Amino acid sequence: ARRDIVVDLINDLCDGNLIILWAAATNRSDLIKDVYERYRRFCQQKGEKPFSYVHFYSNLSYLQSVGLVVLIATKVDRAWTNRVQLTFDASIAESITRLRFE
């Protein structure tokens, strides 16, 4: 039942938020800056206009508020950054993105 709710929630997301989830699901690194770069590249490939970093981060906060991601503060070298962790199976975001953009 939880899987069905997650699938419905992801299906109802706007394209930008879906691409953010896809980038988080398929990126080797879970650091926010790396996920943002993957998100931007995907948008450019598909002819979508990417969010600015500020709007990207705001949309990540929205995704956290609906329970799809968790942002975890992490110290890297001497600076603090966030990691993005999905709260569901990454293959769900990958398959829904593939269906919507191909």
Regions found by a protein language model. Name each.
Residues 1-38:
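Winged-helix-like regulatory helical subdomains adjacent to P-loop NTPase cores
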Residues 30-102:
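Terminal-proximal interaction/regulatory segments of ATP-powered molecular machines
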